[in-house]
From Swiss-Prot:
It comes from Bos taurus (Bovine). It comes from the Eukaryota. This is ATP synthase F(1) complex subunit gamma, mitochondrial. Component of the ATP synthase complex composed at least of ATP5F1A/subunit alpha, ATP5F1B/subunit beta, ATP5MC1/subunit c (homooctomer), MT-ATP6/subunit a, MT-ATP8/subunit 8, ATP5ME/subunit e, ATP5MF/subunit f, ATP5MG/subunit g, ATP5MK/subunit k, ATP5MJ/subunit j, ATP5F1C/subunit gamma, ATP5F1D/subunit delta, ATP5F1E/subunit epsilon, ATP5PF/subunit F6, ATP5PB/subunit b, ATP5PD/subunit d, ATP5PO/subunit OSCP. Belongs to the ATPase gamma chain family. Pfam families: ATP-synt. One of its GO terms (cellular component) is mitochondrion.
């Protein structure tokens, strides 16, 4: 009786390590598969970081001269103290983003401020229309503000923005048929390689500028000259916002890809440690089986 019980116990003892070994081998295969996948992802994120760094360096070089355009055009509104009369109802919001992602909260921060601005204007009884520069803004706001979109510009962010791109946006706006009284352009202003700030700058229609009290002192300003300047200043401000937004986006993407690469390195280290421990456990169990088998034969 005792011999049969001993044989049964020995059989149970010898079967259990085989199941454990199979389980550990499956775990090793899973870990190896995950390691390979994460290493491939890390290669991609490192490559994207290098590309973003090169684009960021170029964008930063081009930003300084571009700021002159925007600051100069905005100075007219500030110095002339141009304001929209309270009875004017039509307001335009231009949101600047791009078509590309993997850059943190760059696009969502602009969309968030646009939502807040649109809600405040609607509460004040204003008619609001939206222009989206970049497909990301459209995709974020389409569900909640689709009826307010006037026009959307795509193919933004694939190459550095130029003054010609800003002129096309300004021309489409002026030819859209929407006679706005006042507007605002929302974009991310570049501060440093790790910092940006979502800002809002004003834009005004030709009627608002020409009817401003401070402009009435210039009797020799022709209407065509004022219209040309208004169109040119609008293109300048759009160009300035495009350059600021592009530089902020590339720096944010570079930072995001750097963080992703670091996270991948941490995951690789942890999985490598787990792989080594699991493999060592498998080897130890196999050695125990060999020694136990040799001892049983003796």
């Amino acid at each position: 009786m005792f011999s049969r019980a001993g044989v049964a116990g020995l059989s149970a003892w010898t079967v259990q390590p085989q199941w454990i070994q199979v389980r550990n081998m499956a775990t090793l295969k899973d870990i190896t598969r995950r390691l390979k996948s994460i290493k491939n992802i890390q290669k991609i994120t490192k490559s994207m970081k290098m590309v973003a760094a090169a684009k960021y360096a170029r964008a930063e070089r081009e930003l300084k001269p571009a700021r002159v355009y925007g600051v100069g055009s905005l100075a007219l509104y500030e110095k002339a103290d141009i304001k929209t009369p309270e009875d004017k109802k039509k307001h335009l919001i231009i949101g600047v983003s791009s078509d590309r992602g993997l850059c943190g909260a760059i696009h969502s921060s602009v969309a968030k401020q646009m939502k807040s601005e649109a809600a405040n204007l609607a509460a004040a009884g204003k008619e609001v229309k939206i222009i989206g520069v970049g497909d990301k803004i459209r995709s974020i706001l389409h569900r909640t503000h689709s009826d307010q979109f006037l026009v959307t510009f795509k193919e933004v962010g694939r190459r550095p923005p130029t003054f010609g791109d800003a002129s096309v946006i300004a021309l489409e706006l002026l030819n859209s048929g929407y006679e706005f009284d006042e507007g605002s352009i929302i974009f991310n202003r570049f501060r440093s390689v790790i910092s940006y700030k979502t800002e809002e700058k004003p834009i005004f229609s030709l009627d608002t500028i020409s009817s401003a009290e401070s402009m009435s002192i210039y009797d020799d300003i022709d209407a065509d000259v004022l219209r040309n300047y208004q169109e040119y200043s609008l293109a300048n401000i759009i160009y300035y916002s495009l350059k600021e937004s592009t530089t902020s986006e590339q720096s944010a993407r570079m930072t995001a890809m750097d963080n992703a690469s670091k996270n991948a390195s941490e995951m690789i280290d942890k999985l490598t440690l787990t792989f080594n421990r699991t493999r060592q456990a498998v080897i130890t169990k196999e050695l125990i089986e060999i020694i136990s088998g040799a001892a049983a034969l003796d």
